[in-house]
Amino acid sequence: IDIDTWGVDFGLIDRNGNLLGNPVCYRDPRTDGLPEEFFGDNLVRHYSEAGIQVMSINTLFQLYSMKKSGDTQLEVADRLLFMPDLFSYFLTGVANNEYCIASTSELLDARSRTWNQPLIHRLGVPAHLFGDIVMPGTVRGKLKREIAEEIGLTDEVDVIAVGSHDTASAVYAIPSTQVDKSRCAFLSSGTWSLLGVELDEPILTEEACRAGFTNEGGVGGKIRFLQNITGLWILQ
């Protein structure tokens, strides 16, 4: 079993494994104007570390909004789990963060593929919220016995981390038997249209920042260098 979802949204669980509140959709206006407030004129410097297009919907600014409003969930939370991490946790009881989905948060260091601890410290949220990062292909755990019995499956079913951001899995699934992916661009269309290329390393230049490109994590440690374009959201 594997799970992928949209990016940036998350849930918080406490030390007993309880979900502290329903996740809030990234379309919520609570983050409006927060990127400018948080970074001021330092966007280019931040981009040189995170490599992610600065957008108010990103996890960074959702957490900043919670911090500013004094949301008590942050005081009792033990782990932050992005949506596919959260669903996998419900199935296995194992809490970790998959790399591709974590990269959408704007809280990773694009070069090291690890949490940006100085940024997390500046944000003012507990560092322990951010758990181990696992790569696609990692077995997260076994399906819980009670769930397996309920649906008639053996309890030896693996729950596996895929490219848990749906675009990461879509790009990885591009047929490549006859094609050199390094010479191809991709266009993945849904709520958003994502136009880009797959690279071995991020592009963290000022030009890339000002042009609105983002460096999201891909399967196999790749980088999806792309632009977010309006997709089917209006129709949806």
Predicted regions and their residues:
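Glycine-rich phosphate-binding loop of actin/hexokinase-like ATP-binding domains
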Residues: 10-36, 77, 81-116, 157-236
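Active-site phosphate-binding/coordination module
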Residues: 2-60
